[in-house]
Amino acid sequence: MTDLRNRDARRSRWLAAAIAADLLLVVMQAVACAMYRAPHTGDAQSYWELALYCAQNHTFYPSPRDEFALYIFGNGYVNLLSLLLRIRETYVWVYAVNMAFTQLLVFSVYRIMRRLCEGREAACAAVTLLCLLPALWGEAASSRTELCFMGLAFASLACAMEDGTGWHALSGVLMALCNWVRPLMVILLPMTLLLLILRKKRLRCIAAYLLGAAAVIATIGQATKSLSGHFIYQAQTMGVNMLMGNNDDADGSYDNTVFGEGKIGYISEDERGVTYQVRDAFYKRQAVDWIVRHIPRFVQLIPRKLFYFLSTDTYGGTPYLGGGTETDNLPYLLSLRDVLLGRGERGFAFGDAVVIFSQLIYMAVLALFALDIVSAFRRGTWVRMLPFWGIFALACGIAVLTVGAPRYHMPYLPIFAMGAGDYLLAGRGGAAEPDETV
């Protein structure tokens, strides 16, 4: 009787912690949106301008005018945002979309963990840790694809774990939609199929999943073909990223100089009229040729790329410094060191505290995730987490083929939180047990 009361009390504490963490997440996202005052730059600016153009001209992306763009990216996100901007041209839609998809992500992680583990303690632990990651806080203030993609991707995984062909068809639809936002189906599709197989789903469930995805791909591709003359379903940025990470001057992160005159990615002024498809194929070919000719150098870059990919998680602090200071680069981190040592040219700011907390909580969650992998093999429960580990492993492979950047690990933060939650409850002798269907 005492054990039952203790378990109920623990369950109540974890549930309260999850609710409190989610409320904190909502509040901190709202604060980030209110504090971001600087003009948006980079991808955020590009997505916004593309969506605004589509809204004002009653068209969709990509259109014929994009045929000679550097690349096509963020297709699904741009089109969603453009539809909302036709109602009213306000950046508030960005905040609303980001916060809505964040809540979809939180609920999806909870459902996944409930299916993986008996009881809700591990699910609440995973949600608590996920909501405490400031990467999710600050991202709400920018018109980027991360939160939209993550919400759709993990909703797809959650639906795949439910019973019934309708859920699996919906999972396929959501998977295709998330890939329309960000082209990572090459990672998610095989691991979702593995998840369905490990959970002993029938062939009709797998067929429903594939048909759901195929229906969305065909619909979007055909609609784009009628608009632009080309069957375009997903972004085409692989060539650019591969070449930035694989050239003579590559250091593991971005190297934009590879596109300059005299470099292997240079396209002369006389050839500026090439389409994004031709350009993408050219960049891929140049990158592959470089890898083949410089295999030892490519291998040497692997640790650097993975270091850039996983070592820091500080980009969420940018909005809390007004948006004008990027917090995911070495110059900022050096300036923060000087501030902490009393040598800085400015005082300690709220955004600095967010950055420090972000790095600390990220490293803690990542460490718990690593411990859970070891613990799962010891407990003999590794099979249930295998598809999620596979997603992360394939993501590392993509980083090795392209470039390593801190923001690129953001879509996999929920997997880190899930592993950490599992370790806290099951790996350390808690009550969480593997799902019987696995």
Spans of model-derived segments:
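Loop-to-helix entry region of an early transmembrane alpha helix in multi-pass inner-membrane enzymes
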Residues: 71, 75-83, 87-107, 124, ...
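Membrane-interface anchor segments at the N-terminal boundary of transmembrane helices
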Residues: 93, 304-388, 392
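Multi-pass, polyprenyl lipid-linked donor-dependent membrane glycosyltransferases
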Residues: 42, 72, 93-101, 125-155, ...
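Membrane-proximal stem/loop segments at transmembrane-domain junctions that anchor or position
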Residues: 233-332
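Specific aromatic-rich, kink-prone transmembrane helix
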Residues: 108-112, 148-167, 171, 175, ...
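Membrane-interface alpha helices of multi-pass inner-membrane proteins
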Residues: 127, 159, 168-182, 192-195, ...
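Transmembrane-helix motifs of polytopic, lipid-linked glycan transferases
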Residues: 93-117, 367-374
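Extracytoplasmic catalytic/substrate-binding loops of multi-pass membrane glycan-assembly enzymes
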Residues: 36-50, 56-62, 67-80, 88-92, ...
